[in-house]
């Protein structure tokens, strides 16, 4: 059996053929499901458009500065739109979002620095040589797809993914800092005699840049947490959480025009990019005619960076696709890793020949897309199930009939072209069945208020489902294409706002990164570790000894320093993906010898397992002997802060021992009114 599996994995084109067969069966349904959603599909479309377009605009400005205008925002937007349209129509996994990513920007900057240092290439043949790199990259991706290389994607474990994510976050911070510093200086190849480049105006531009950078960073981070605000309606908080970041970019851009009229026109400095119809933006479309001018030696030398880029794209594209198809999303349609790598090769080739930086699967936009479609699918299913349940209740049907009618609706809407009936659905709806059936028992006992109300109680029992379709990806890609034509408006954005956005992307990507969480734990003294347990925390905090966790984290820090250090090597920096490829062997053969296998499974778990916090008893401050036994050390000032308000008043704490009834329809232990007890203590 094992030999058959090995032989099967070695068959050429096996993965591509299987992917095409699987997706062909549901291709029509991919479009029908999107069109059937009506105007509801516009919500996830606009959400992903903003999440996709803003980073691409920022990367375009970074490329423009680091390649001295050879590439700009026009090219990054054009590549994202072109590849997005192709993938949404021909791609295997339509939930995957494509875009120009930071690794691509980094690679193209290395290629530029190499080209301008060679008289045979220079800036004039930079894009032509980059096109040859893309040709080699495409060929390598074709070979990977044909050889079924995507079978090894699961060997890239959490260690590799989180190290890579941390590297990108640090590079974002690095770019933000470099950008803020550059606001105090004069751009290259500019006339120093211009009014806006006098010292006082450069200094003013830098100070304004700091205000806009940190202003955007602070407001963007705050808006992302809007769902947990105590103020505003649910719709308002959801809107701010979903669209707050692009809204803050608009707000701070508008504020940048409120500066005094005596400031020169170039203060604050704004995004510099040629318009799509200007000659600098049109020249790269004909880069294919310059490819013949590249000498054969450099054509073959292009294979080396192509090898790095192909490996990087394989890793980045596959991981993005993997996270867009997490098992928690309960997707019904098959994956297409092998075919998508093949298609990525064709898109890389097209972009290279057009003088565009290639696009690949991006994070976190891809899982964000799936999540937004899960919300849409939930709304569609809920609406129909509530309508059916209300109709059954109005007809005074039994609880059994009410549940059967709702189950029938769910199964009908959950049908897949590949599996018309899924036996697991019955199991997933078991909690809903118990809730509906128990409501009948409660009504018989005369407790009508405890009856099942579909409007209030259905949400708690609906399984996760995703509206798997192609329309939202196509529409958001067309919107990105429209953004190319909106360049006159995009150029109004101050560059300092983009530096703030880089910092925002870095900080926003850290929560959930266990490497970062363990890094912060190293700075928590023994006497304060109980604070970590009071809040929600990853499972390794309780299951792995502190010494093992610290050793594993220190090893990651060392390896991260190695990866980051490679990016600083002038020409050899293009080899920075190599350490990540080596992690496959290190994780499989070396780490198991250094760490307990059980501990290693927790520290490098495939899933993010979180344990709820266990807050201390609110009265525990009155019993210091208990704390001393646990080694908890708190100063008198800290104790006093917990006992008093900011006005210096002693707090009166009321302990409520009643169980929280909330919106749960049937708590395990049902407490009747008056059974609880209230006790008040004065500290």
From Swiss-Prot:
Q: What is this protein called?
A: Boron transporter 4
**The keyword Glycoprotein is annotated on this UniProt entry:** no
Specify the species: Arabidopsis thaliana (Mouse-ear cress)
Show which residues sit on the Cytoplasmic side of the membrane. 1-38, 102-126, 182-200, 260-294, 357-477, 587-683
Keywords, sorted A to Z:
Anion exchange, Ion transport, Membrane, Transmembrane, Transmembrane helix, Transport
Compartments (UniProt record): Membrane
S-S pairs: none
Q: Which InterPro entries match?
A: HCO3_transpt-like_TM_dom, HCO3_transpt_euk
């Amino acid at each position: 059996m094992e030999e058959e599996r090995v032989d099967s994995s070695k068959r050429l084109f096996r993965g591509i053929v299987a992917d095409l067969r699987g997706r062909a069966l549901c291709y029509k349904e991919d479009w029908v499901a999107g069109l059937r959603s009506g105007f509801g599909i516009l919500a996830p479309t606009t959400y992903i458009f903003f999440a996709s377009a803003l980073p691409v605009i920022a990367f375009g400005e970074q490329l423009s500065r680091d390649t001295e205008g050879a590439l700009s925002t026009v090219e990054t937007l054009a590549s994202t739109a072109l590849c997005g349209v192709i993938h949404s129509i021909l791609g295997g996994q339509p939930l995957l979002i494509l875009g120009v990513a930071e690794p691509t920007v980094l690679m193209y900057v290395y290629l530029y620095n190499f080209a301008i240092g060679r008289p045979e290439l220079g800036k004039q043949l930079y894009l032509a040589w980059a096109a040859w790199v893309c040709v080699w990259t495409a060929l390598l991706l074709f070979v990977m797809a044909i050889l079924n290389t995507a079978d090894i994607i699961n060997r890239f474990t959490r260690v590799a993914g989180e190290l890579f994510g941390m590297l990108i976050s640090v590079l974002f911070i690095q770019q933000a800092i470099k950008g803020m510093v550059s606001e105090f200086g004069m751009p290259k190849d500019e006339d120093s005699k211009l009014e806006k480049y006098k010292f006082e105006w450069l200094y003013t531009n830098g100070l304004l840049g700091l205000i806009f950078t940190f202003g955007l960073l602070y407001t963007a981070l705050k808006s992302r947490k809007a769902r947990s605000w105590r103020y505003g309606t649910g719709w308002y908080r959801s809107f701010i959480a979903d669209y707050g970041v692009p809204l803050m970019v608009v707000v701070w851009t508008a504020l940048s025009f409120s500066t005094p009229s005596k400031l020169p026109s170039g203060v604050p400095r704004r995004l510099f990019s040629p318009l799509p119809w200007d000659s600098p933006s049109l020249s790269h479309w004909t880069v294919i005619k310059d490819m013949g001018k590249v000498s054969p030696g450099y054509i073959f030398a292009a294979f080396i960076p192509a090898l790095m880029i192909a490996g990087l794209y394989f890793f980045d594209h596959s991981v993005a696709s993997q996270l867009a198809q997490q098992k928690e999303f309960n997707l019904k349609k098959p994956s297409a890793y092998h075919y998508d790598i093949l298609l990525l090769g064709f898109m890389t080739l097209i972009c290279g020949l057009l003088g565009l930086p290639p696009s690949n699967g991006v994070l976190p936009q891809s899982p964000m897309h799936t999540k937004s479609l899960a919300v849409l699918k939930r709304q569609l299913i809920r609406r129909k199930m509530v309508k059916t349940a209300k109709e059954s209740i109005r007809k005074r049907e039994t609880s059994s009939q009410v549940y059967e009618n709702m189950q029938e609706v769910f199964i009908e809407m959950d049908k897949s072209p590949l599996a018309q009936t899924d036996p697991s659905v019955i199991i997933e709806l078991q909690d809903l069945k118990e809730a509906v059936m128990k409501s009948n028992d409660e009504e018989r006992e005369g407790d009508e208020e405890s009856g099942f109300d579909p409007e209030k109680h259905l949400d708690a029992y609906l399984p996760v489902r995703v509206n798997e379709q192609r329309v939202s990806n196509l529409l958001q890609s067309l919107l990105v294409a429209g953004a190319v034509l909106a360049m006159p408006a995009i150029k109004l954005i101050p560059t300092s706002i983009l530096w703030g956005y880089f910092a925002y992307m870095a900080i926003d990507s850290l929560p959930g990164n266990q490497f970062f969480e363990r890094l912060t734990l190293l700075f928590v003294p023994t006497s304060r570790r109980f604070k970590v347990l009071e809040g929600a925390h990853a499972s390794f905090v309780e299951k792995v000894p502190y010494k093992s966790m610290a050793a594993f984290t220190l090893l990651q820090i060392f390896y991260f320093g190695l990866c980051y250090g490679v990016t600083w090597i002038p020409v050899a920096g293009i080899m920075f993906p190599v350490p990540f490829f080596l992690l496959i062997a290190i994780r499989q053969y070396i780490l198991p010898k250094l760490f307990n296998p059980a501990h290693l499974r927790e520290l490098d778990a495939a899933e993010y397992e979180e344990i709820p916090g266990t807050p201390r008893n609110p009265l525990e401050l009155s019993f210091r002997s208990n704390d001393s036994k646990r080694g908890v050390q708190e100063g008198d000032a800290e104790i006093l802060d917990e006992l008093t308000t900011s006005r210096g008043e002693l707090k009166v704490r009321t302990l409520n021992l009643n169980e929280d009834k909330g919106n749960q329809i049937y708590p395990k232990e049902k407490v009747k009114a008056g059974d609880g007890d209230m006790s008040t203590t004065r500290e």
